[in-house]
Amino acid sequence: MQSWIQPLSVLAWQRLGEYLHETQLLGSIQSTLYWDQNTRMPVAGAAWRGEQLSLLAKQLHARQSSSQFEGLLVEARAEFEQARLAGELEPIQVVEQARNLELLEQDLRRQQRLDPALVGELATAKSAGYARWQQARANADFSCFAPALQHLISLRQEQAQQLAEQRSCWESLAQPFEPDLTLARLKELFAPLRQRLPDLVEKARAWPRSRAVSLGWDLHETTQQGLCERLLQQWGRDLSITCVARSPHPFSITLGPQDFRLTTRVVPGQPLSCFLATAHEWGHSLYEQGLPDQSHQWFAWPLGQATSMAVHESQSLFWENRVARSRPFAEQWWPRFAQAGAPFTCAQDMWQAMNPISPGLNRVEADELSYGLHILIRTDLEIALLEKGLAVKDLPGEWNTRYGELLGVRPMNDAEGCLQDVHWSEGLFGYFPSYLLGHLISAQLSEAMTEAIGAPEDHVHRGDVMPLLDWLREHVHPLGRSVNAEQLVEKVSGRPLSTEAFLGYLESKLDRLHQASQPLQV
């Protein structure tokens, strides 16, 4: 158990903890309504749900920016300093308590800069935006969503101005997802990917498609669900604390210390989509379950929260790509899929089907090689929308042009294009780079894991993935917000974050897939 969860006394520190706990309860209610909106709520309930979420957002903001909260922080800081100077704390307690206070004070300042009216309006706009996005996506009609998107952009720009953090608009909005990230650093990290990924995609485009990928096949929804349930069981699912549902866009969410939810979706004609989405979202959930001290009393302390969304993505990508898409995994699972109706006659069939190299339109269904290009396009476009004057009405055309240039494909309609993701409908500008940063982090952490306990594929081959989870539980999950993403990577791997491990991994896997696609020489 982490030392920081022990209160310094029953006085200021305990009162602060009780206040944070009540704030977290409100946040949990808000998350529960979000879960319901995405999984079960009837479409006509959107307006009322918007009012509910707006009220909760204003109440949360009031608590997170109140003079009472500020006073509790001042008292807790004084109590901490007194105990530190008196030598009453262990060195680790000093470091961890100081970090908790630093993060709470930082979050308080950010909340105090925001107008409560703007907070409420944003909550309403996000709920309405999601409803409009659903309608627009179903009808492949961007014009239905455009006014809601413009409203969200205007509100987010106003939010960035109010925060006045000496950052650009996009940087300011990205901070909740990637603390301390700057555009300059993002451009530095993404530059080698912009240069190398298009060449790798073009190289792979000429390959012959594997038999399993070329065959048109599907599995019944209940069959897909059964395979997903079997996967989660093998990967240690505890039915008493987890719940799985369906939604238009897969996601994972934590509603409480013992309440972890995830969703998946069934895509007609893409029978592996549901399985891989489940693996991905379960990786998110495993990370949440492994964060420090998930108990009712301490759930809300900063050090018990996720480091960043890029670290979150690194964990989901590890389980999806390093485990579920691995050759040893296919060796174990292809008979189960074949028995369920898949046209697999050997492990290679399933492995190639799990790893198609075929640049397409959809980010969620993208292969590992072209995925980064999807993120580069979205990152550039949201920066253009927020900072460079790209008109909302021009977004579909600009989207289609960039897809043609980078991926060699063009959407037939808006649903295949700029309406495919939910993020902008919820005002989540600054989120998309976390996906690609997550790939970089996952690759570098996987190298560190390999050096420590052997390659992940070796453990998968032995049929025991628990050592992989144990290593992550020991070295990654417990860090919480004690560090930012880049500090975590350097602490665990011993090297600054770079693209080297990720590009090396892609090129190695590309070579193996290419060899597997060649006809046998007789």
Task: Annotate the PLM regions.
Residues 122-273:
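Contiguous, non-catalytic segments that form substrate-binding/exosite surfaces or channel walls
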Residues 440, 444-453, 457-484:
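An amphipathic alpha-helical core segment
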Residues 2-179, 507-519:
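A well-structured
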Residues 313-314, 375, 379, 383, ...:
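Feature representing long, continuous alpha-helical segments
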Residues 325-426:
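Long, amphipathic alpha-helical stalk/connector segments used for oligomerization, subunit docking
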Residues 462, 473-517:
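C-terminal amphipathic alpha-helical interaction region
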Residues 273-292, 313-317:
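Active-site recognition of the HExxH zinc-binding catalytic motif
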Residues 370, 427-447, 499:
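C-terminal substrate/ligand-recognition segments
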